[in-house]
Amino acid sequence: MNLATSLRGQRLRVSAAAIALSTLVCATSAWAQDTAVAPATAPETAPKEDNTIVVTGTLFRRANTETPSPVTVLTTDYLNKAGISNVSDAIRSISADGAGSIGTGFQSGFSAGGSAVSLRGLGVSSTLVLVDGLRSANFPINDDGHNAYVDLNSIPFSLVDKIEVLKDGASATYGADAIGGVVNIKLKKQFVGLEGKAEGGLASRGDAAHQRISLTAGFGNYEEQGFNVYVNGEYQHDGRVSNASRGFPYNTTDLSSIGGIDKNTADSAMTTASPTAYVTRVAQTDLNNPLSGGTALLNPANASQYTALGLGNCTSGTFTASNGTGCKYDLVNQYRQIQPLQERYSANGRISFRVSDTIEGYVTGSYSHSYVSIWGTPQVIRNTQPFGAAPSVASSNPGIVLPVYICASGVNCATAANRTLNPNNPYAAAYAANPSQGAARIYYMFGDIASGSDRSNDVYRATAGLHGRIADAWDWRVDGVYAYDKLKLVQHGFINIAALTQAINTGSYNFVNPSLNSDAVRQALAPDKTTPSHSETYALDASVTRKLFTLPGGDLQLAVGGQIRHEMLENNNQNVALDTYSLTTASAFGSHTVSAAFFELDAPVFKQLEVNASGRFDHYSEGFSRFSPKFGFKFTPTKAIALRGTYSQGFRAPTFAESGPRSQYAGFVSSTPPCAYILAHGGTGNTTTCSANGNPYNTTYNLGRGVVGNPNLQPETSRSFTFGTIVQPVRWFSLTVDYYNVKKSNLIVTGPDIGKAVSAYFASSNLDAAKAAVAAVGPGYSVNTVDAVDPLYPNLLPRPLIINVPYVNANYMVTSGIDLSATANLRLTDKIRWTSRIEGTYLLTSNLHTATGIQSYAGTFGPYDLSSGNGSPRLRGNWQNTLEFGEAFSLSLTTSYVGRIKEVATDQGSLSTDCSQNLYGTGDAFCYVSPFITNDLTASMKFGNGGVFSLMVKNAFDARAPIAPAAYSSAPNFLTSWHYAGLIGREYRASVSFKM
């Protein structure tokens, strides 16, 4: 069977499964919540409490979770049966998680190594993450250079009691950032005894090693003794997975064997940077400066234009092109990794105490460490200048050269007394008498210098609170939180600008045989760059609630409260001296104090009708204020059916990266020149479908957007509403359906017309016309940096490398969809119980309304500029089926589904979603990424008094990630947000836990 036939078969199987899933797809139902939220791991000695709880999104205790707002609850029992072992995977499995979701597998973004959720696809900045109802410090590096979020990797998993996901706006309760929804991770309140778990596993390919251990110990019967103390620790390690280990198509950008495009020019073009150096003779206008190479090629017409240095060192064969012979490389296969090395550990503790019969208190402390080690492709010798540096330091424009002469000092070598001919320059001897005409322009990748980063993130967090009651009338609470997030980022392999000049002029670096270079030479050329950054949050919350009087349906309750919160960020510039090629200059600084007052009123008007109203006023020290109201209702005409709905307004305050006057960044997105440009530069095909034809200048490259903070920005605002039904015709089955609609206005965007600016640039005939065309797009748009000219077509328009764009409040976005859920809980026999829970989200619309038209994202790769550019799948869902055989044995199958995605993105220039706008450039071919289904199987057996042994097979049927050729070049042909399990493949895990 060939690959194409196999792929067609997989599509048929996936489509059939999708049809089956779509008939049941849902989000956790209200009845399921009442059944599932009771923590299966609660200790037998836990204190007895009443059956009231506080559900995320309300200030009141209530007897059930059937609030007017849709809430999904993930219990530890559900997560264990799904084989999930960290908070990131748990939360990102929610079907409401959409575009902009960040997984640890996305390693090339600004905040690589962090993980975040993006509810409703509105971005990580529009999702509020709480721990026990309180905020935490944001990850010190902003996603996409400006989006703020809490790193999910920093939250201890073994202490999780349950995770509640509120899927509508909640600014009226929690303030800023809750536009898309709220994730509240609830940790254990008390624990008595000793509990531990050990887990290990391996992928079927022999890698992706996984180890995890946790231990919790506690004492003090709170019910009888009035106190409880527990401590907890956990450790997790996950090994690397290379692209090479997963084979085609995840280890190459050459899809020509299945009818795609060959974007791997490292095995066919001598102007592609690779570990073999290629040189061609050019002029050198300043013999003391390697950055002053000329544009025109000076080789004789009857000689090859390019010469390979060290051609005899080729390990994968050679290729012959019209301009010379070179070594074959597939750089993705040789250097890239799918999963980084990850290590996490944490220590946590809590003291709960009763001050009196009416006052209770608690104190918690936690420390978590998350380490991520990323390997990347080695750095190259031709680079643009760092963002903010002078164009004169660019090594790509017109091109860095090896001089004819070298000397010990590296200064004025052409006239130095101790000068020698440059052994790295094959033209040196012939042009010893005329060194200005014998320079060797070089294309090279430092394959002997490992490139990557180590990211250590330490989060310190402490909370304390007192809760009590006054005269059986007023319930009050005061809670405080302090969180400090410290990040240490160590970058490896980035080339120092001055050191490169020195190494070239002294000849200390061997380009002919790089294996002979000493570690000292490599370290001097690419010293490690260490950058510390940190963020801090502290807040004090206080509220009181009171039952005012009794209505026909129950007690009318009122809650009022206030908050004061301080936040700060110091995200330091990794390249503050502008002395290193390719290293980002993104930075963000700021601090503010927020004061807020809020209220909530809950009125059970009748037994059949509950009405809820709330509001919050927030004032920011920057000078702006915002009032956020919310209204909700729940109507239950019969026990079998209920209707519910909410309306709310919310806001997202500008992040420090967006508004800080000292903040800046240059973000890069994979871009492919339009076909007309490719054809002009030697490509083949037509204006709709074209190929680079071996010219690397025509292939996908990184196009930057340069932007600085704008202190005049105003908050984003939102309007959202939900309407749904809860149906429970029989006790063992329930169903919910909720429609949501969110409008986010006054969006804070970076260059909303960047696509128009790029199109205007490429449509121009020369550089001056291109600069004028980009400037005509609007204020703040300009050409910052252009590439060196195409060596094969030096008289044509060069590519743009960075286009300046403004931060502005502009446009509005509307997203809508349907959440569905169903739960069945049947006792098949006296000893066999079957539980089936299914949840899913169907995205109806996701539209950005701009001055030039509507950008439609639903079911496409749009918004491509957001985070990992993994798009907005229309349908996501999860279905868990469990058979329990008495009390001793259970078998669970958890199925996850992601619908197909069209490889177009209307934020990339064209508002059309037709396949003619395929980002891959092949029209109808490869226009869709196929649906994806994975199945995780878990078998658990109880033993002794509290022991559990489990065997898990993740991705049991070894489903492969569907091919996504338009994905970012850093993740060739796959989508890390949705298809990660299909990259790792089948995994085997085993765990044993005990409790006593």
Across the structure, where does each feature detected by a protein language model lie?
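N-terminal Sec signal peptide and the immediately downstream disordered periplasmic leader
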Residues: N2-R92, S214-F219, D357, A462
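N-terminal plug
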Residues: P43-A46, V54-F110, V131, S136-D143, ...
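Short loop/turn motifs that connect adjacent beta-strands in outer-membrane beta-barrel proteins
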Residues: P47, Q190-G193, G206, Y222-F227, ...
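Periplasmic plug
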Residues: S111, A116-K167, E195-A198
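Surface-exposed, low-complexity loop segments enriched in small/polar and acidic residues
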Residues: D144, G247-S256, A296-Q342, N348, ...
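Outer-membrane beta-barrel translocator/receptor signature
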Residues: G145-V150, F157-D161, A172-V183, K189-Y250, ...
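C-terminal beta-barrel architecture of Gram-negative outer-membrane proteins
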Residues: A666, S836-K942, F957
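C-terminal beta-signal and adjacent terminal beta-strands/loops
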Residues: S734, S745, L844, T894-S912, ...
